[in-house]
Regions:
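Nucleotide/phosphate-binding catalytic cleft detector across ATP-hydrolyzing
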Residues: 1-165, 173-322
Length: 322
């Protein structure tokens, strides 16, 4: 019996959603066993060598709060690997944690990847997973995985649409007969909304806030359409004029204004996907095409409220006028 075969006896098959904001690990027979931020904290020594200090939730708490010799890094950007070595370290940590720290574990892994990923980016994910301890690596396109998980009738001879808004990318796909008929992947999602909120507050109030604060604003009072009540939240940051700490109040209307371009880009991607549908699928009434809107926890509730159509009416994702 070979060493990989022996290692396989100590391993469990895993499915990994390697997201820009969060990484989820699913174990066969147990369901989702890990859901942690895709963040790694590293310490640099005098020679510039890096050492992993923490991964996941503990590392995310360090973002924006570290001294000069410690950095908190997100190795994923726009749905793909931005730092190979750190992504490998993060994957190794999650694999070992999923196997209760067992070093002999060499599992078979299936990883979700964006539909618009290049061969170079796909190879980087495969090599990172193998270096992290995977025995075999398989891929599934994220729109297909999301559609199956959402319960869409992907094997039927009619169109289904999935709109998966994550941290780094938004995946829009039309599926039929077990395959992806057409898909659009845009690098506009939760992270871009955070950046838009930071820039909006910086320009309007001359106040500099961090990405964690922007995410908190988005998930607390963010919205894509006016609600019944105007919500507000206190924001703390650094006054760019005086350089001192400052507190101000921002309301939900301002947040909606700040992320309007990002919301429009996502709606435009949905429209483009519909325009690319084959004529045969277009024979089905639009109202009969099941559309699922999946939103990353780091983006809710900014887009969990209905979006307006072009006439300003409130529409559900299923009946959105595009």
């Amino acid at each position: 019996m070979t060493l990989p075969s022996i290692s396989g006896l100590f391993s469990h098959d895993l499915a990994i959603d390697l997201g820009t904001a969060n990484t989820l690990v699913y174990m066969k027979g147990k369901g989702i066993i890990l859901n942690e931020p895709s963040v790694v904290s590293m310490k640099k020594d005098a020679r510039g060598a890096k050492k992993v200090l923490s991964v996941g939730k503990e590392a995310k708490c360090m973002v924006g709060r570290t001294p000069g010799n410690i950095v908190a890094i997100r190795p994923m950007k726009d749905g793909v690997i931005a730092d190979f070595d750190i992504a490998e370290a993060m994957l190794r940590y999650f694999i070992r944690k999923a196997h209760a720290g067992r070093r002999l574990a060499r599992p078979r892994i299936i990883i979700g990847v964006p539909s618009g990923i290049t061969e170079v980016e796909r190879k980087a994910v495969k090599e990172a997973a193998e270096s992290a301890g995977a025995r075999e690596v398989y891929f599934i396109e994220e729109p297909m995985a999301a559609a199956i998980g959402a319960g869409l009738p992907v094997t039927e001879p009619r169109g289904s649409m999935i709109v998966d808004i994550g941290g780094g990318t938004t995946e829009v796909a039309v599926l039929s007969l077990g395959g992806i008929v057409c898909s659009i992947s845009v690098r506009v999602a939760g992270d871009k909304m955070d950046e838009a909120i930071i820039e909006y507050i910086k320009k309007k109030y001359r106040l500099l806030i961090g990405s964690s604060t922007a995410e908190a604003i988005k998930t607390t009072i963010g919205n894509a359409f006016p609600g019944d009540t105007l919500e507000s939240v206190e924001v703390k940051g650094r006054d760019l004029t005086t350089g001192t700490p400052k507190v101000l109040t921002i309301d939900s209307d301002e947040v909606r204004e700040s992320i309007s371009e990002e919301v429009d880009a996502i709606v435009s991607a949905v429209r483009t996907a519909l325009e690319q549908m084959p004529p045969e699928l277009c024979n089905d009434p639009l109202e009969s095409i099941p559309i699922k809107l999946l939103i990353s926890p780091c983006t809710q509730p900014a887009l969990s409220t209905p979006a307006p159509d072009e006439a300003g009416r409130c529409c559900t994702p299923r009946s959105m006028t595009l």
